[in-house]
Amino acid sequence: MALEMFYDDDADLSIIQGRKVGVIGYGSQGHAHSLSLRDSGVQVRVGLKQGSRSRPKVEEQGLDVDTPAEVAKWADVVMVLAPDTAQAEIFAGDIEPNLKPGDALFFGHGLNVHFGLIKPPADVAVAMVAPKGPGHLVRRQFVDGKGVPCLVAVEQDPRGDGLALALSYAKAIGGTRAGVIKTTFKDETETDLFGEQTVLCGGTEELVKAGFEVMVEAGYPAELAYFEVLHELKLIVDLMYEGGLARMYYSVSDTAEFGGYLSGPRVIDAGTKERMRDILREIQDGSFVHKLVADVEGGNKQLEELRRQNAEHPIEVVGKKLRDLMSWVDRPITETA
């Protein structure tokens, strides 16, 4: 089924220019949204807790900053870009008490709304504008007169203008220059979590560690194992990112291509796909989010223990040593003000 696409001519920038936008959070996406909204002629304020380390940066970049509660009280469009695990508390304590009929509540990711951790009042529009790229790229593309593709979704639309408002917001951050895809909170949330857990983060990490362990256990130097399964991964992913699987195989040697075709299905087989389906079901039925919330409420003990275990893996030890030799890595990303 083809998804509905929107571009510059489909969005009216004046809609969001006639609203007051409060951006809650100033991380990767928060800074990109706030600065680009401002540059598009939108009234914008940033909501951060007193004492937040990001406050001086916001002020240096010429934006107004106040507490989340005061920003929510001032705004009639509130974009929630705080971390997923902090959003429900911020909503309950700072945003919800200050929402007015006719306001709009926007999100950059649908998790909290889709799984019922945030339940907006019925007289407020609820929509999502989610750029498919990190904040520094969103901002850089905007400054260059281009844009990053976005997803938009409308979950609640009491006045019938939710989509037009979301598209206007997307235009203000450059999204309609590249293209905006209409989706749902359900589809965005579940596909995002599935991709992270089975491929992008969880699956890739475990594949890399397993390959490293097999080579080291077979007697090969850890340094060579690191180069072959982790360092060179970026080269392959960049090729896929630029032109798909065909571009990747076109660019590698015939030996690598032939070996990949033969051996890849032996590593990722029907059993792997079935376990991926199990993970998808756990996402869909809320089991994963239940575990996430329970860990947050328990002080993130499981997350901290898993982080500790990961940091102690031998691939991290040898990787640190090798990356110290590479002058082109581990440099901070430059933000475009």
From Swiss-Prot:
KARI C-terminal knotted domain mapped to chain residues: 184-329
Tagged with keyword Oxidoreductase: yes
Binding positions for Mg(2+) 1 per the UniProt entry: 192, 196
Positions of Mg(2+) 2 binding: 192, 228, 232
EC number, as in UniProt: 1.1.1.86
Cofactor(s) it depends on: Mg(2+)
Pfam families, per database record: KARI_C (PF01450), KARI_N (PF07991)
Annotated InterPro entries: 6-PGluconate_DH-like_C_sf (IPR008927), KARI (IPR013023), KARI_C (IPR000506), KARI_N (IPR013116), KARI_prok (IPR014359), NAD(P)-bd_dom_sf (IPR036291)
Alphabetical GO biological process terms: isoleucine biosynthetic process; L-valine biosynthetic process
One Gene Ontology cellular component: plasma membrane
Domain of life according to the entry: Bacteria
Binding site for substrate: 253
Binding site for NADP(+): 26-29, 49, 52, 54, 84-87, 135
Location of the KARI N-terminal Rossmann domain: 3-183
Swiss-Prot/TrEMBL keywords: Amino-acid biosynthesis, Branched-chain amino acid biosynthesis, Magnesium, Metal-binding, NADP, Oxidoreductase
PANTHER family: KETOL-ACID REDUCTOISOMERASE, MITOCHONDRIAL (PTHR21371:SF1)
Known partners and oligomeric status: Homodimer.
Name of the protein in its database record: Ketol-acid reductoisomerase (NADP(+))
